[in-house]
Curated annotation (Swiss-Prot):
Role description: Catalyzes the reversible adenylation of nicotinate mononucleotide (NaMN) to nicotinic acid adenine dinucleotide (NaAD).
Cited SUPFAM superfamilies: Nucleotidylyl transferase
Family the entry assigns: Belongs to the NadD family.
UniProt-listed GO biological process terms: NAD biosynthetic process
GO molecular function: ATP binding; nicotinate-nucleotide adenylyltransferase activity
Organism of derivation: Oceanobacillus iheyensis (strain DSM 14371 / CIP 107618 / JCM 11309 / KCTC 3954 / HTE831)
Gene3D superfamilies: HUPs
Name of the molecule in the record: Probable nicotinate-nucleotide adenylyltransferase
Keyword Endoplasmic reticulum attached: no
Record pathway: Cofactor biosynthesis; NAD(+) biosynthesis; deamido-NAD(+) from nicotinate D-ribonucleotide: step 1/1
Amino acid sequence: MREIGILGGTFDPPHLGHLLIAEEVRRAKELDEIWFIPTNTPPHKEDTTTSADHRTSMIQLAIDSHPSFKLNDMELKREGKSYTYDTIQELTDLYPSHTFYFIIGGDMVEFLPKWHRIDELLEMITFIGVSRPGYSLQTSYPVDFVDIPTIQLSSTILRERLQNREWIRYLLPDSVMQYVREHQLYGFGRN
């Protein structure tokens, strides 16, 4: 039996905050792997600004050097909204001997009551919550919390900084920054 942490998100772009969360949860919970699952269209957000191909390429570059980090693009292959319930149902069907843990930030903890089929989902997985500045970790739902170093970092902030040609070194893996430059993503590198 393998124990797998699931880190879902748009990863637009993937940044060091994502990697820090993944590694700290993996270590604290002694998980075998962390699977990064980019969403197609999350129910709580509008469409992403960057294509799925670019996002998966950037994730792969970001996680390449870590033997316990894997990319799983199953949600990108589905049409429409990406619901966690559908993803976990598919994963448990494909990997019945695995135990899955779904990693969420403090920003998502407070929305658990609104999640699609939350009661059924709670029977299938364990949620692992990590703190995020400005959000409460208080919930009546069963969530295992992992205390990790927090940084005020989001993909939204990084996209804005890239568009404004502001300094972002040390916030993105170098390989991802190189990819952003080469493909002129987020307005970076355009005249």
